[in-house]
UniProtKB/Swiss-Prot annotation:
Recorded coiled-coil stretches: none
GO biological process terms held by the UniProt record: maturation of SSU-rRNA
Cellular component terms (Gene Ontology): cytosol
Keyword NADP tagged: no
Annotated Pfam families: RBFA
Keywords carried by this UniProt record: Cytoplasm, Ribosome biogenesis
Location of this chain's protein in the cell: Cytoplasm
Official protein name in the record: Ribosome-binding factor A
Protein family (similarity comment): Belongs to the RbfA family.
Length: 120
């Protein structure tokens, strides 16, 4: 049980720190825009590897390029995280595209369209 709590806290902390780096423009890459959001972080059982699922809250934003840029900057991101957290080793990050936000925006548009046609 302790490992699950530790894993959950670590996942939350990593997500928050990556989000802070993106919003504060700590990563100086023009492909990484402030509309990016960390959807979730999943650690491996041994806490050595972490998948970071990234989404965009802006429709039409190029998520593929942003994920490539984040993977290129993962060494820098890991070094920034290790400055803020006290663990023996920082996990190896892998940034992955997550389309769930854009799909939910699409479903919302459909529902809004149905509501407006129903009102007319």
């Amino acid at each position: 049980m302790y490992k699950n709590i530790k894993k959950f806290k670590l996942e939350s902390f990593i997500a928050q720190e990556i989000g802070n780096l993106i919003v504060s423009r700590g990563i100086k890459d023009p492909r990484i825009h402030s509309f990016l959001t960390v959807v979730k972080v999943e650690f491996s059982k041994d806490l050595i590897n972490a998948k970071v699922f990234m989404g965009s809250i802006k429709e039409g934003a190029s998520l593929d390029n942003a994920v490539k840029a984040l993977n290129n900057a993962k060494g820098f991101i890991q070094s920034q995280i290790i400055k803020r957290i006290k663990v023996r080793s920082t996990p190896k990050l892998l940034f992955v595209k997550d389309d769930s936000l854009s799909k939910s925006f699409y479903v919302n548009k459909i529902i809004e369209g149905l509501n407006t046609t129903r009102e007319n």
